[in-house]
Amino acid sequence: MVKQDYYEILGVSKTAEEREIRKAYKRLAMKYHPDRNQGDKEAEAKFKEIKEAYEVLTDSQKRAAYDQYGHAAFEQGGMGGGGFGGGADFSDIFGDVFGDIFGGGRGRQRAARGADLRYNMELTLEEAVRGVTKEIRIPTLEECDVCHGSGAKPGTQPQTCPTCHGSGQVQMRQGFFAVQQTCPHCQGRGTLIKDPCNKCHGHGRVERSKTLSVKIPAGVDTGDRIRLAGEGEAGEHGAPAGDLYVQVQVKQHPIFEREGNNLYCEVPINFAMAALGGEIEVPTLDGRVKLKVPGETQTGKLFRMRGKGVKSVRGGAQGDLLCRVVVETPVGLNERQKQLLQELQESFGGPTGEHNSPRSKSFFDGVKKFFDDLTR
């Protein structure tokens, strides 16, 4: 039976770097791993092919031999006893790729995931209601573009730690007990960098500022948080990057107040309009609209304008605009206006105007009863 090309098995090109090969291998190994495909002989065979291709293409000597001679380079024991004739060594996979997910690892400490970042973004009410796209600039740690996160000088590879032999742990004996501890030489990574990258000095990451375009959905409010996956700090030595969280803060608006998906505003009217009624213009986020004010309107009355509020970022009906009327006392009156008001007051039957002011009548009736009770 003709064996499939190792590069085709992993789905990479013949010029692929080791980093690309490892990435492809991890993805395929996770898919075809026997623990995920119990009893599936085809998946087990596919997994062995993937592991075989990975072991050859990540070993510089074996890869060079394969590139020159193909599969013939490893026939009849050509791999020096390391071949693939026997069953696949799943414990290596557990340790290198899946760590403690399947519980069979060798204890190697995986490189740390990058830290999450937070960015506080101030928005106007209009931006929060309608949605907006904003560019932000953040300082972060990015993967070194020279060593691609390995920390090693280009052309070199991290070396297996001589203390723990790549396991990331050492065994300490205390009497009858053996205790495993993180290797102090490599800090649990299992490898050491002999020739560090000149740009990142072996860290695999460099400090840099980057600009991102952030799309803010319509309807967000103060306290909402937007997650940008993978836009946090780069992970150590090729580990996954962290996330960026954009925290929303909506600035105070000069006219509107927001409560949930509803907007509130105060609308001043003069007392003649309040008494007689009429039509006024009120502001909305979409422009001015007409509002009919009925006669005998009192301060504090709310008028609801449906659908003129905020559309929820989580879906559902749009909120309303509630206009709270404030009846203003006139100021700066001329003599003619004062005279007319005096005549109006007299027509009410005195300062209280009980017949035309139901709240005043109720108030003064209560005051009268209070003093009557005191004198009994």
UniProtKB/Swiss-Prot annotation:
CC cofactor: Zn(2+)
Record PROSITE patterns: DNAJ_1, DNAJ_2, ZF_CR
Keyword Transport: no
Domain of life (superkingdom): Bacteria
Any one GO biological process: response to heat
Keywords: Chaperone, Cytoplasm, DNA replication, Metal-binding, Repeat, Stress response, Zinc, Zinc-finger
Molecular function (Gene Ontology), one example: ATP binding
Start-end of each CXXCXGXG motif repeat: 144-151, 161-168, 183-190, 197-204
All residue ranges annotated as the J domain in the record: 5-70
Coiled coil: none
Zinc finger (CR-type): 131-209
GO cellular component, as recorded: cytoplasm
Cofactor note: Binds 2 Zn(2+) ions per monomer.
Compartments (UniProt record): Cytoplasm
Major location category of this protein: cytoplasm
Record-linked SUPFAM superfamilies: Chaperone J-domain, DnaJ/Hsp40 cysteine-rich domain, HSP40/DnaJ peptide-binding domain
SMART domains membership: DnaJ
Binding site for Zn(2+) 2: 161, 164, 183, 186
Entries under NCBIfam families matching the protein: DnaJ_bact (TIGR02349), PRK10767.1 (NF008035)
PANTHER family attached to this UniProt entry: CHAPERONE PROTEIN DNAJ, DNAJ HOMOLOG 1, MITOCHONDRIAL-RELATED
Family to which the UniProt record says this protein belongs: Belongs to the DnaJ family.
Assembly, per entry: Homodimer.
Domain notes: The J domain is necessary and sufficient to stimulate DnaK ATPase activity. Zinc center 1 plays an important role in the autonomous, DnaK-independent chaperone activity of DnaJ. Zinc center 2 is essential for interaction with DnaK and for DnaJ activity.
Entry function: Participates actively in the response to hyperosmotic and heat shock by preventing the aggregation of stress-denatured proteins and by disaggregating proteins, also in an autonomous, DnaK-independent fashion. Unfolded proteins bind initially to DnaJ; upon interaction with the DnaJ-bound protein, DnaK hydrolyzes its bound ATP, resulting in the formation of a stable complex. GrpE releases ADP from DnaK; ATP binding to DnaK triggers the release of the substrate protein, thus completing the reaction cycle.
Name of the protein in question: Chaperone protein DnaJ
Organism: Escherichia coli (strain K12 / MC4100 / BW2952)
Name of the gene: dnaJ
